[in-house]
Each structure stands twice: as C-alpha cells, then as structure tokens.
A protein has these predicted regions:
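C-terminal beta-strand-loop-alpha-helix "lid" module of Rossmann-like NAD(P)-dependent dehydrogenases
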Residues: 1-291
Length: 291
C-alpha cells in the first residue's frame, strides 16, 4: 500500500491548495467590488475638472500653458505603464505588456527615443529586464492607492513634456469592462486632444461666465495638472478592478481544477486499493487450496 499512501499525500496536498485558491477567490471578489466603487466615485470629479478646464481653455485661447501645447514632431515619446504589483491574475499583465512593447518597438524602428514611468512592480521588472529607460516608478501601491505616491513620477514625466524633452505621452493599462472581460488600453495622455477641450455638447463656446481668482490662466494651469492626475488615477483604479476580476476568475479556475484533480486521484486511489485487496484475497484463496 506504499502507492496508496503516496496518492493520499497528493490528495491532501491538492486539498490544501484548493483551500488557498478558494480563499483568494473570495478575497478578490470582495476587493473587486471595492475597486468598482472607487472607480465610480472618482469619475464625477474628473468630469467636473474637465468641464471647467474646457471652459477656461476656450475662453482664454492665448493661455500659453505648455501642457496644452502640441509638439509638431515626435522625436521622444514617454509612457505611463500601469500594471499590478502581484501576480496570479491570469494574462492581465502579459496583455498590457504586449500592447506596450508593440508600440515601443514601432517607435524604436522609427528612431524615436522612449522613456517610461512604471506604476506597478510587474511592469517595472519587465522594463528593467529588457533595458528600457525607466525615469521614475511607484510600486507597492496597495489596495487603495494614494495620490501622494503617484505625484513624484507623474510630475517627472509632465515636466519633461513641458521642457520639450518628450513630445508625446502614452498611458497603457487594463480597462475594466466586466467581471469576465478586461482589455488592454493605450491612450495618448499628452498632448491633450481637442475632444477634451470641448464642452461635450458639440458647441465650441460656453454661454456661462465665472470670475476666477487669482486669474483664469492660473486656475487653468492648476486644473490641467489636476485633470491629468485624475485621468491617471482613474486608469489605475480601472487596472486594479481588472486585476481583482482576473484574479477572481483565475482562482475560480484553479479551485475547479483542484476539485477535478482530487476526483481523479481518489479514483486512482480506490482502484489501487481494490487491486491490493483483490491480490490479497487471491493469495489467501491460493494458500487455502494448497492446504
């Protein structure tokens, strides 16, 4: 019965693993709901900032704000790469990195230099392993990321755009569609598109006027920063919701696979036990017949 003992050991090992994956599935389900709530709560703020910024930009065309000025030629491109800090979330990070690296390769073939800001340890490790120029990073962001952790890296890359050290900035992350679907997304963060500097109604001007202190330009310059930060935070929240959804699905699949493995091992154990009993009975009968 040495074989039977080995099978029992494997069954217990798989059962222990199943308990872990089941617990991780339940934790991911709870965290996913919280990240979805955070996404919904962050959206109204970003929309209101965009609305006020649009009004100020349209009524102050000669604002002279560098973050709103497009660069004529792209010689250097920057990326804000958003990935998770932890694994066990299926192909989530792999899909984001695939989209990111495809664009990086395209730029490199055109002779365009690339610089990267990494939010998340998985993206940072991938960029370092292939020798990309990482100018700033933020890792170990936790389940509830704080804007204070993002300000340093974001300020670094935005200042490079203002100084014309970067001509375009992309943001790459995983967009949360639903529990079963998360899609890699790449957006141009800078220069800010004309669709952003619009009131969203198709009209090119606003009928309402406000007085801004200390001046409309000063307020606009402040809001542009806040808008960009809110867009990145929204993308980070999307990515975290995608991470928890992907992990929940992956852990459910692992739990189901563990259950199937336990059934198969139990079947093998019962067959080996039955064969051992049959052999013993045959030996007893043969011994009795010999007597």
């Amino acid at each position: 019965m040495a074989v039977g003992k080995e099978i029992l050991t494997k069954i217990r090992s798989v059962q222990n693993t199943q308990k872990i994956t089941k617990a991780m599935q339940m934790v991911s389900t709870s965290k996913m709901r919280k990240t979805q709530d955070r996404m919904r709560l962050a959206r109204p703020y970003a929309e209101k900032v965009r609305t006020v910024m649009s009004h100020l930009a349209q009524t102050n065309a000669d604002h002279g704000i560098k973050l709103l000025e497009p660069h004529r030629e792209v010689r250097r491109a920057g990326f804000i790469l958003i990935t998770s800090d932890k694994g066990l979330c299926g192909g989530l990070n792999a899909n984001v990195l695939k989209k990111f690296l495809a664009q990086v390769q395209e730029y490199q073939e055109q002779g365009i230099e690339v610089e990267v800001v990494c939010l998340g340890s998985k993206g940072l490790a991938a960029c370092q392993s292939i020798g990309l120029n990482v100018i700033a990073s933020a890792t170990n962001l936790g389940d509830t990321p704080k804007m204070e952790l993002l300000l340093g890296p974001l300020t670094e890359i935005f200042q490079r755009y203002e100084k014309h050290e970067l001509d375009r900035i992309h943001m790459v992350y995983s967009r949360f569609v639903n529990t079963m679907r998360q899609e890699p997304r790449m957006e141009v963060l800078l220069p800010i598109g004309e669709n952003v500097i619009d009131d969203g109604t198709g009209h090119s001007s606003f009928t309402w006027e406000y007085l801004y202190e200390p001046s409309p330009i000063a307020v606009l310059e402040y809001l542009v920063r806040r808008y960009l930060e809110s867009v990145v935070y929204q993308a980070l929240s999307d990515n975290m919701a995608s991470e928890q959804a992907a992990r929940m699905v992956a852990m459910k699949a692992a739990t189901d696979n563990a259950g199937n493995a336990i059934k198969e091992l139990c079947l093998v154990y019962n067959k080996s036990r039955q064969a051992a009993i049959t052999t013993e009975l045959s030996e007893i009968v043969a011994g009795a017949a010999a007597v």
